[in-house]
Amino acid sequence: MPKMKTKSALKKRIKVTATGKVIREQAYRSHLAQNKTTKQKRQSRKSAQMHSSDLKRFKALI
C-alpha cells in the first residue's frame, strides 16, 4: 500500500517543532479588526500550540 500524502492545506498552516509540538497561527485575524479590542488583536499576533484533542485528528493528515 502506498504512503498517504500530506494534506497541502494543513502543511501551509502548521509547523511541527523538534519536540513534536504543533504550532499554529491564531484565528479571527484576517478582517473586521475594527470590531475587535486592542487586547484581542495584540494577543492574536502570537502563535499558539495545537490542543491535544485536535492533535489526534490532525496526526492522520500530517
Swiss-Prot record:
The keyword Cell division does not apply. GO terms for biological process: translation. GO terms for cellular component: cytosolic large ribosomal subunit. Residues 53-62 have a biased composition (Basic and acidic residues). InterPro entries: Ribosomal_bL35, Ribosomal_bL35-like, Ribosomal_bL35_CS, Ribosomal_bL35_sf. It comes from the Bacteria. Belongs to the bacterial ribosomal protein bL35 family. This is Large ribosomal subunit protein bL35.
